[in-house]
Structure formats: C-alpha cells, structure tokens
C-alpha cells in the first residue's frame, strides 16, 4: 500500500488535486520477516541480502529515520507508510515509540500513517492503537475463500482466510479506517465480478494488484522469485495473464459503473480518471516519471523502490547520509526518469500512453513488435481496460468539468 492517506483518488476531488509530494518513503521495520509464506510474495526472499537474520529496526535508527524524513521532505503533509514483511511483528511498543518520535519532530507539519498488514496479528489492542493514532490500514485479502487460500498460507502451510476475516470484522467493529488490497492472480482470472461483489460487501475502498512473476526451481525448496532475465527463470504458475487481468478489471468496472460510482472506490478507476482529467495520479505506476517513493530497510539501507530492492539500486544508508540527499541524487533522479525515457517507441505512440505511461517498470520485461525491450507484459490487458472504459471516463471528465458529480455516469448504464 502506497503512502497517500486514503490510497484512492476520490472522484469528487479529482479536479482539485495538486502535485504529488516532493518525496515519500516506505519503511520496513522488520525487513522481509513475515508470519505468512504467500507463494507470490516478491519480498519474502529479500532476507538473503541480509544473511537470513531476524531483522528489527533499532530505536536509534527509528529516530534517525523519522527526523530525516520529516525535516528533509518539503511537503506539508508527511505520510509514513509502514510495510514488510509483516510490520506488526515489530510489536506495539515499537509503534508507540514511533508515534512519540513523530510528535517530537513534527513541528508545524501534518503527520499521517498508513500500514499494510496480512491481518493475522490484529487484535483489540492493535485496533485501539490504530484508531487512537488515525492509522489507515491496508488489509490483504484476495477475495472469496478459495481464491484467498490458493496462495496465501501461513508458514506451516495452513490457510488464512478465516483469520483475515476475523481481523476485518474486528476493525469494522472498532471503527478502524482501512481498505482492502487484493492481488489478481491465476486463481482469480475470470472471476472479476464475483471478487468485486464479495469485497464490496466488506469495504468501500479496494485496490487490485496484478501478479506477474518468474521463479527458479530449487531442489527441496520452494521456488525462488527471480528476474525474468535470469537463467532458468520460468513464469510462476500463480501469474495472471495480460488478457486475464484486463478482463478481470473490465468485469469489475462493469459492476462498479452500474451501481457504485461515488460510493465505492477502486484505485485503478480513480487513477485512470485522474489521467483523463490531466491531474497527476496519486499512484506512481501511472505517472510519467517515478522515484518519489524510496524504501528504508530495517538497518537503514535506502533503495530506489519497493520493487527494486537489489544491491544495484541501493542509494545509501541513513546512518551515513541524509534521505533528502539520496532522493536528489543522480541515481534516484535517473531511476525516475527512466520510467519515461526507456520506453519503446510503440509505447510512446500508443493512444493510451497518457493513461498508463507504461505502468510500473517492474512489469517491463516484454518486447515491442519491432523488438525493442522494456515493453510492459500487461500491455494487452491495459489496452483492453482503457478501450472498454473510454466512453465512461470521457463522460465522467465532462461531468467534473461542468461541476457535476461523476456519479451521473451511472445513467449511461440504465
């Protein structure tokens, strides 16, 4: 979950949104440590970078991070995004100390906190903490039980759906502000409407993240998620196809645009409308350039992006340098510009380029028709979605420009 307050662009506010923050961070207080062993987790093997030790951010490092981030970022609102692994494994005392340090260094700035969790450790005490400190919590839930439990197991191989639903019900009952993050994978292909209806009954805010990964088989061990360029890399069996992802999102959209515009919020629809309206979207993957969201690991190492935690993308360490300087570094600025500059010509000439800007570099391991590299492997699916939603997005843009609610688009389906 990225570090904007609601992680969605509200349709009523789309015309009023300003520029994205100067820079943001995602912090990993326990690194990749987790109490689950989800098949598709792109972060679970990052522990190998740090010698497979049990990581935990020290209090000294926590204070350094909070001070540097608040004092180094130019925006008035500072959004802390706590991530993992499973960040709740850091414990409540750690997070209470973090809140104390935020108050110490806040000055006249506004502090926001978001946190992504699998829900397993959520209890009454955690809910009270979230509620008292105004956290926005992202809960990982892939859909109905058979979809969720296909790839989201605990470390003993047991399913997790019932425990996640218990956490969801507890957060609802205690008034915790949360949204739902769902992956779109091989098990959920063809079931977009079903998944949306299920999630719609649970929460008004949802995100759908496509899973496309490559693995290398290891004798006697689970497959290792690797770059598709690595020798012996094969597509992971849980990956969604481009067409499957596109159809999934079209099916979700058809349900949403008939009944739910303005009352239920789907991140992809919000960022698509933002680009239609010429407003910078709040999601880096759909902007022209990226690089505004660095990652701070448990030991203070800083990387260009959550999806690029590899030695070649390490920018430094906050115990030896300043976050703001790492953001302004040639390496990070070049990383952000490459999102735009490295795209193949076919991409830049596409009628839908202004809507996706090539999407996230993590998915750019395909080839254009002329053989140019860096093509997004989900391109076909995104084109399907953009074609399908085109008339509705145009109409919502017109409504917003006239000062009318975007929900008027639902009349098109009646």
Where are these regions (language model features)?
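Flexible mid-to-C-terminal extensions adjoining Fe-S/redox cofactors in radical SAM and related proteins
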Residues: 309-414
């Amino acid at each position: 979950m990225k570090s904007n307050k609601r992680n969605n662009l509200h349709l009523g506010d789309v015309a009023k949104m300003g520029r994205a923050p100067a820079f943001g961070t995602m912090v990993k207080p326990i690194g990749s440590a987790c109490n689950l062993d989800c098949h598709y987790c792109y972060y679970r093997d990052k522990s190998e970078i740090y010698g497979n030790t049990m990581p935990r951010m020290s209090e000294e490092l926590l204070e350094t991070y909070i001070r540097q981030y608040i004092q180094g970022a130019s925006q008035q609102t500072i959004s802390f995004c706590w991530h993992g692994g499973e960040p709740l494994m850091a414990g409540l005392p750690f997070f209470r100390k973090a809140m104390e340090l935020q108050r110490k260094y806040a000055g006249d700035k506004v502090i926001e906190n978001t946190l992504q969790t699998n829900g397993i450790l959520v209890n009454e005490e955690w809910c009270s903490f979230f509620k008292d400190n105004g956290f926005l919590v992202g809960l990982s839930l892939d859909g109905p039980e058979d979809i969720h439990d296909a790839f989201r197991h605990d470390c003993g191989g047991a399913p997790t759906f019932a425990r996640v639903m218990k956490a969801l019900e507890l957060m609802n009952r205690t008034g915790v502000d949360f949204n739902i993050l769902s992956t779109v994978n091989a098990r959920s292909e063809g079931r977009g409407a079903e998944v949306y209806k299920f999630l719609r009954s649970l929460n008004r805010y949802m995100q759908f993240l496509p899973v496309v990964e490559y693995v290398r088989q290891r004798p006697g061990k689970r497959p290792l998620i690797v770059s598709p360029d690595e020798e012996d890399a094969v597509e992971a069996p849980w990956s969604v196809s481009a067409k499957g992802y596109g159809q999934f999102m079209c099916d979700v959209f058809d349900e949403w645009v008939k009944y739910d515009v303005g009352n239920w919020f789907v991140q992809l629809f919000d960022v698509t409308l933002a680009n239609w309206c010429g407003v910078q979207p709040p999601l880096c993957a759909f902007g022209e350039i990226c690089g505004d969201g660095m990652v701070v690991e448990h030991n203070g190492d800083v990387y260009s992006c959550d999806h690029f935690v590899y030695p070649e993308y390490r920018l430094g360490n906050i115990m030896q340098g300043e976050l703001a300087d790492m953001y302004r570094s040639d390496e990070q600025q070049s990383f952000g510009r490459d999102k735009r500059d490295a795209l193949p010509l076919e991409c830049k000439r596409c009628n839908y380029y202004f809507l996706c800007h090539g999407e996230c570099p993590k998915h750019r391991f395909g080839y254009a028709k002329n053989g140019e590299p860096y093509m997004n492997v989900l391109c076909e699916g995104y084109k399907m979605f953009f074609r399908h939603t085109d008339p509705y997005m145009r109409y919502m843009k017109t409504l917003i420009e006239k000062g009318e609610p975007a929900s008027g688009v639902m009349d098109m389906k009646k």
